């Protein structure tokens, strides 16, 4: 895999997966353009950072216009919720679609015109293995990630003949501090290490994956 000379937008960059993907992009010679709602003061010194609300379509368009040339988009921003599907409430339901779907939609709306103008680009989204089939306690989360997966397929069908590859990874549980805290009785050795998932994401953003379109790639670890 080689991302040399490629400018890659990474949303959710300040999170556990975002940090791993940023490190992988840099290791493969790419230039990360880091996006999140806010960044710690000492986060990724020397890298280009853009702090704004991805659910705000107008703000997203303004910030993407400032980024200049974009070769790849990695939509990592997202959130997770567990609870009875009948009892999540409007706020919880809306939050899952705002964080998992609206963030992706606003970035795609801003970035795809740039890629179409240059005749090339890659987009990698993050779905979920838990959304392939309905799971107990994951109603709103699974529904929102199902939208991500269907959007990935639709975007691929629309853009593949225009030089743009659109694919998604479908991880099981990612080994992050937050997940370890939320699931203290689980065995994290069976989860997906962020660095391993980052390598798959970077592969899909590389020229080595040029022939891959609309794939939903399971990354399950040992779970």
Name the predicted role of every residue range:
Residues 84-85, 92-97:
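Substrate-binding pocket helix/loop in short-chain dehydrogenase/reductase
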Residues 108, 144:
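Active-site helix of classical SDR
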Residues 76-82:
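Conserved NAD(P)H cofactor-binding loop of Rossmann-fold oxidoreductase domains
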